[in-house]
Each structure stands twice: as structure tokens, then as C-alpha cells.
A protein has these predicted regions:
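RNA substrate-binding interface of SAM-dependent RNA methyltransferases
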Residues: 119-206
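N-terminal positively charged helical leader segments and presequences
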Residues: 1-118
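Short glycine/serine/threonine-rich phosphate/pyrophosphate-binding segments
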Residues: 134-138, 230, 255
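Active-site helix-initiating loop/hinge in glycosyltransferases
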Residues: 45, 128, 135, 252-254
Length: 274
């Protein structure tokens, strides 16, 4: 568990609201309001919702669940409202695979990089202008799977943590700490000063990734957007660049696939911090 990720709510705590299900007033349910930046967001899908309910840093406003899905709910301080699948379809974005369950909750507050470092993180991912929310969610999920406790994103040119990201992350946004920074290059300098070996992925590098991460006590993996890759200033700020060896017939990997491979390689090749 990453305690830092669980201690940055927009608002502290969650209002106790009982344990039994109730039925909402249906007219209000069918008037969805657009999400505003910094305001409450909808999260949906079993893994995303269960993880949000288990996170004490989440302030949950509403828990909507169908009759079929209510049996899967753990005991919670949040009173579930029984709805139909059609109700959820109307409330959530088109195409949302909700599995009969959704919550409306305040977003988690991003942490400061210095706090993540002080917390004792040894594996951190840094994303340079990765803008696709599905890729971002998948990267959160891989980070959680391979022991990366922090994900550094740009304040701009990176998507907010919406329900789409949360669904792709399968609950990992509740345990992997989000950090936002204006300047990725400066963040890499800060990581280097804290003893992190910063490795940027670049297909043109002659150095294989397994050699670049071998023996590092603290590691930061840096990934750029698909197509352009790392920006020149960000690449220059990395301690070194490395590549994932792939077949010559393929030019590159999807950024979320590359992240999963890189995180695995780093977790396998790095050494525990003293």
C-alpha cells in the first residue's frame, strides 16, 4: 500500500451515510451535469469503485448500483442508491462499461514531488505529454503491479484523472500517487538530486533497458508521447536513454505496453534502497 496516495483528498474524510440501500428520486437522476475541472467526477466499474470506497481519502457524494450488482458491495459508510442499468447509461459518458456500479466523488489532490520522495519512494514513473486517458489508466495499473508508487505528470498536456482513466487503471489511481508538475525537466533534476537514476525510453538509443536499470537503488522511468517520444529538453534531463529491444519489423510499441515492460524490467533489475 502507498500511504501517500491515500492522504491527498480534495476534502478530508467521507460523510457517514448508513449501510442500507435506498432508492433515489428518479427525475433528478436523469439530469446529468457536466463535470467541471476540480469538481466531483464519476468513477465506474467494479474495480474502480471498490478501490474508491476502500480509500479513506475519497469523499464520495453518491453511490449508484443496480439490483444485480448490489450484492457485490462491501459494507460501506456510503448509502447505495438502487438504479437500473439504463439510469447509469444516461448518467455516465456514452460507452461507459459500468458493470452496474458507479460513484460520484471528489478527485484526489495530487501530491508534491518532494513529499513523494520524502515518503521513501524508490520507483517513480514520469510521463512527458502522454495525453490518451486509456493509456494513462493502463500505465497507472502497470505501475501498481510492479511497485511504482508515484506517477509524475505535466500540469498541462496531460489528461485529468477522470472515470475513463480510473476504469482503465482498475483501481490503481487509489494507490499510486499522482504528482503534477509544470516542468518535467526540473522534476527530473529534482529526482536526480534525490538519488534517482532517471532513464528515458528512446527507440534510437543503443543501450538496452535491462543494462540501464541494473543495480539502481532508486529508479525513475521516463516515457514520452507516442510518435514524437520524449521532447529534446526532457531527454537531455535524463541521466541516460535506453531502448526496449523489439523486432526490426516493428517501429515502436504502444506507450502503455512500453511502460509495462519497462516497469517490469526496472522491478527485476533494480536493487532495494539502503
Amino acid at each position: 500500500m502507498n500511504p501517500l496516495a491515500r492522504n491527498h483528498p480534495k476534502r478530508p474524510g467521507r460523510r457517514p451515510q448508513g449501510n442500507g440501500p435506498s432508492r433515489p428520486e428518479q427525475p433528478g437522476l436523469h439530469r446529468p451535469r457536466p463535470e467541471t475541472e476540480g469538481g466531483p467526477v464519476w468513477l465506474w466499474g467494479t474495480h474502480a469503485v471498490m478501490a474508491a470506497l476502500a480509500n479513506p481519502a475519497r469523499h464520495v457524494h453518491q453511490l449508484l448500483v443496480t439490483e444485480n450488482a448490489v450484492q457485490r458491495l462491501p459494507r460501506s459508510q456510503v448509502l447505495p442508491q438502487i438504479v437500473t442499468g439504463k439510469d447509469l447509461d444516461q448518467r455516465l459518458p456514452p460507452g461507459a462499461v459500468h458493470q452496474g456500479i458507479a460513484v460520484k466523488a471528489d478527485p484526489l489532490e495530487p501530491a508534491a514531488l518532494e513529499d513523494l520522495i520524502a515518503e521513501g519512494a524508490t520507483r517513480i514513473a514520469v510521463l512527458d505529454q502522454v495525453s490518451d486517458p486509456h493509456n494513462l489508466g493502463a500505465i497507472f495499473r502497470s505501475a501498481a503491479a510492479f511497485g511504482f508508487t508515484g506517477l509524475v505528470l505535466q500540469s498541462r498536456n496531460a489528461p485529468p484523472i477522470t472515470g475513463v482513466v480510473a476504469k482503465s487503471a482498475a483501481g490503481a489511481i487509489e494507490t499510486v500517487t499522482e504528482v503534477r508538475t509544470v516542468n518535467i525537466s526540473r522534476a527530473l533534476e529534482q529526482l536526480g538530486e534525490a538519488g534517482f537514476h532517471t532513464v528515458g525510453l528512446a527507440g534510437e538509443s543503443p543501450r538496452p533497458l535491462d543494462l540501464a536499470v541494473k543495480g539502481a537503488a532508486k529508479i525513475a522511468i521516463v516515457l514520452g508521447a507516442e510518435g514524437p517520444g520524449l521532447r529534446p529538453g526532457v531527454a537531455k534531463a535524463c541521466a541516460e536513454l535506453a531502448r526496449i529491444p523489439i523486432a526490426a519489423a516493428m517501429e515502436s510499441l504502444n506507450v502503455s505496453n512500453a511502460a509495462a515492460i519497462a516497469f517490469y524490467e526496472a522491478s527485476r533489475g533494480s536493487s532495494p534502497a539502503a
